[in-house]
């Protein structure tokens, strides 16, 4: 598991509300209405996290989601302005293919993947969502892919070879 990243040490974190859903629970007396929020936070410098929150009011659900996102920050390795290598992130029915892109090509990603890349500070990347299109599944799959990224020096150390080979 990745080590904990203290959100207070990072300074100013930006927030992006990806989705707000109205959810209901059917009880004997009728329906109970609540709101579910999915939020991305990041410092545009390699740190990004996502969280979910649920409450009877939208602002409270967003506040809970932001707190959850700050508790689940990850560090994203980069090479220049892009990611080190191609990776497939999977979570449930959601699959997201992340590919490095040449400098200046921008973020070619749709839906909930774009704000993740922007708040992580990755200006050049290509992403394709395969499988489930649900916002939560796509976000979880994207984060799975970002967690599986490895820098060249880490891979070289694992293989026991020097970086020049």
UniProtKB/Swiss-Prot annotation:
All copies of domain S5 DRBM, residue ranges: 13-76
Pfam families with a match to the protein in the record: Ribosomal_S5, Ribosomal_S5_C
MF terms in GO: rRNA binding; structural constituent of ribosome
GO process annotations (BP): translation
Subunit-structure text: Part of the 30S ribosomal subunit. Contacts proteins S4 and S8.
PANTHER family in alphabetical order: MITOCHONDRIAL RIBOSOMAL PROTEIN S5
Family: Belongs to the universal ribosomal protein uS5 family.
Function: With S4 and S12 plays an important role in translational accuracy. Located at the back of the 30S subunit body where it stabilizes the conformation of the head with respect to the body.
Protein name, as recorded: Small ribosomal subunit protein uS5
Provenance organism: Oenococcus oeni (strain ATCC BAA-331 / PSU-1)
């Amino acid at each position: 598991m990745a080590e904990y990243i203290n959100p207070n040490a990072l300074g100013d974190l930006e927030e992006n509300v990806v989705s707000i859903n109205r959810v209901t629970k059917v009880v004997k007396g009728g329906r109970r209405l609540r709101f579910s929020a999915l939020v991305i936070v990041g410092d545009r410098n390699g740190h990004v996290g996502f969280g979910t929150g649920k409450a009877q009011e939208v602002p409270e659900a967003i506040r809970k989601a932001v707190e959850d996102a700050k508790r689940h920050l990850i560090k994203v390795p980069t090479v220049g302005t892009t990611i080190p290598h191609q990776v497939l992130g999977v979570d449930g029915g959601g699959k997201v293919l992340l590919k490095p892109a040449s400098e200046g090509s921008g973020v070619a990603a749709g839906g909930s993947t774009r704000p993740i890349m922007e708040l992580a500070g990755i200006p050049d990347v290509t992403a394709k969502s395969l499988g489930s299109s649900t916002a939560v599944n796509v976000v979880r799959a994207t984060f799975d892919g970002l967690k599986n990224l490895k820098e060249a020096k880490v891979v070289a150390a694992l293989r026991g070879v020097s970086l020049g080979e």
